[in-house]
Amino acid sequence: MKAVVVKGHKQGYEVREVQDPKPASGEVIIKVRRAALCYRDLLQLQGFYPRMKYPVVLGHEVVGEILEVGEGVTGFSPGDRVISLLYAPDGTCHYCRQGEEAYCHSRLGYSEELDGFFSEMAKVKVTSLVKVPTRASDEGAVMVPCVTGMVYRGLRRANLREGETVLVTGASGGVGIHALQVAKAMGARVVGVTTSEEKASIVGKYADRVIVGSKFSEEAKKEDINVVIDTVGTPTFDESLKSLWMGGRIVQIGNVDPTQSYQLRLGYTILKDIAIIGHASATRRDAEGALKLTAEGKIRPVVAGTVHLEEIDKGYEMLKDKHKVGKVLLTT
C-alpha cells in the first residue's frame, strides 16, 4: 500500500510503498476513509516532537472502516466506522479506569511512536477506537480527534457554563472555525477573532460577533469574556489574557511557534483570578460528546480542500495558505 513516510529527524517525507499492516492481539486494521492535515504535522517535520521514532507514517487524524480484527478484540467488528484518539492508552492504568486516557503514563502517539494514518490502510489499537454514529459524516468525524473533541474537552475542563461568552482566536483556521461551533453547541455566546477582513464574513456565519485585528482586547472588553480558546499561541496570548473578565479561563490549544516564549505577569492572573489551561488531547468521553453534536448537526465540518494521498505537497500548500478557511482533508 502507499503511505506518507517521514524518513528521519528533519529529513522530510515521501510517498512510497510499504507493507500492508497485519493486526496483532488487541489491534484492528482500518481502511482510511478520510485523514486530516494539521499544523502539528509541520512542527513534527521541523523536529519539534522528540518522541518520534523513524521511519514513521505521518498523520494523526482519521476516520476509517474496520477491515480486520486481531485476537482478543471485542466490541468492534469488520464494517464498523471508527475514529482513533490521537494516542493509544494502555486501557488498564489508574487514569484509563477513570476515563482520563489522555493522562495514561504508557500512552503511545500516532505519527510519533506508532505509525499514523496517511496511508491506504492503518493499524490501530482497540483502546484508541471510538465508533462513529450513522448520522455523522466522514468529514465531520475526522475533525473530532484533534479539533472538535479537543475543544470539547478544553471547554469541559474550563467548566463552561451555559450563557457564558467564549472568544476564539484564529477563528478562521481549521481549529478555530470549529471551536466557534463547539462552544455555541455547548450553550455559549461566541466571539471570533480574525486578522482578515476577507475572512470576517465567513467567521460571522458561526460567531455572534467578529473582531478583526491582532490587537483585539479593547474591543473584546465591550462585553464580559469568560473563556478564551487560543488556537494561535504566543502572538495572541497577551491579548487573550487582557480580554478576559475576572474569573476568566484561557484554554491554550495553539502554539504556532515553539521557539517563542511569553513572560507571564503573575500579579495580573492573581488579581483577575484567571486560570490558564494547557490542552492537547481528547479522551474517549470527549470524542463521543463531539461526535454526538456532529451527528445532531450542531457542528458542521468546514473543509478548505481535499487532496489525494499522492497530492500531499498540494495539501500542505493549502494548509499554509492564509486565504483558506477550515481544515484540509486527505483521501486515499
Swiss-Prot record:
Q: Which residues bind Zn(2+) 2?
A: D90, C93, C96, C104
- What does the record give as EC number? 1.3.1.84
Q: Which reaction does it catalyse?
A: propanoyl-CoA + NADP(+) = acryloyl-CoA + NADPH + H(+)
Using the UniProt record, name the top-level EC class of this enzyme in a single word: oxidoreductase
Among SMART domains, the record links this protein to: PKS_ER (SM00829)
Keywords, in A-Z order:
Metal-binding, NADP, Oxidoreductase, Zinc
Q: Where does NADP(+) bind?
A: Y39, S172, G173, G174, V175, T194, T195, S196
The keyword Cytoplasm is annotated on this UniProt entry: no
- Entry GO terms, CC: cytoplasm
| Gene Ontology molecular function | acryloyl-CoA reductase (NADH) activity; acryloyl-CoA reductase (NADPH) activity; alcohol dehydrogenase (NAD+) activity; zinc ion binding
* UniProt cross-references to Gene3D superfamilies, sorted A to Z: Medium-chain alcohol dehydrogenases, catalytic domain (3.90.180.10)
Q: Which Pfam families match?
A: ADH_N, ADH_zinc_N
Positions with a binding annotation for Zn(2+) 1: C38, H60, C146
Q: Which cofactor does it need?
A: Zn(2+)
What family is reported? Belongs to the zinc-containing alcohol dehydrogenase family.
Subunit-structure text: Monomer.
Q: What does this protein do?
A: Plays a role in autotrophic carbon fixation via the 3-hydroxypropionate/4-hydroxybutyrate cycle. Catalyzes the acryloyl-CoA dependent NADPH oxidation and formation of propionyl-CoA.
Q: What is this protein called?
A: Acryloyl-coenzyme A reductase
Organism field: Metallosphaera sedula (strain ATCC 51363 / DSM 5348 / JCM 9185 / NBRC 15509 / TH2)
